[in-house]
Amino acid sequence: MTGKLLLLATFFACMFLLSFRGERKKKVLFFGDSITQMGVDKGGYIDLIKTDLAQRGLSGQYEIMGAGIGGNKIYDLFLRMDKDVLSQNPDIVFIWVGVNDVWHKSSMGTGTDYDKFGKFYDAVVKKMQAQGIKVIVVTPAVIGERVDYSNAQDGDLNLYSNWIRKYAAENQIGLVDLRKSFHEYSLAHNPNNLEQGILTYDRVHLNEKGNALVASEMWKAMQ
């Protein structure tokens, strides 16, 4: 009798633990620069994702976090990922970086050379994967919204975005191709070839429509 009671107690304890485990929220973290830093503000793309989850009745299934810092480049992400990402034990991490790696070459004389960008990027991804994190990579969107590729940094943005696309394919990891999504949107909504005001308010940072587009694309990859 004692043995049966012990067996029953063990069974119910296991069921309780499994039930508790099943209710654990999936942690999703967005890792990046000022665009992601602003994404947590009201109306930002991360805030919109949270709102959408609530409307879908899915808030209990996800914990959404932002870890963006203005001006960050890929090596900044490498240096702070232990503190700002790995310590949070996320299930999914979106890596959205590259604009400052390109932009700061001309604006500040810094930036990140193409070969170093790839090495740091791979190191960031590999370290996250070693902790069992699902990594989704994101191409840098725009530095200027002209649709004819006449923006000053379009050449480098295309180069770095192509590297990210190839890296994602070779390593079989998720990709959100915002470079492509933004260009396709601008082709349809920027007939006057404007430099800003379509999806950004200053050529880089997102306006209302930009945040909505990014939230939609990120959500697709989360599912």
Stretch-by-stretch model annotation:
Residues 12, 29, 63, 71, ...:
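A generic, residue-level signal for flexible/boundary positions that often mark functional hotspots
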Residues 17-70, 75, 80-89:
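Serine-esterase "nucleophile elbow" of acetyl-processing enzymes
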Residues 4, 40-44, 68-71, 110-111, ...:
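Short linear motifs at secondary-structure transitions and domain/linker junctions
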Residues 6, 19, 29, 65-68, ...:
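Generic detector of intrinsically disordered, low-complexity, polar/charged segments
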Residues 1-5, 9-25:
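Bacterial Sec-dependent signal peptides at the C-terminal "C-region" and cleavage site
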Residues 23, 50-60, 76-223:
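Alpha-helical cap/lid subdomain in secreted, periplasmic
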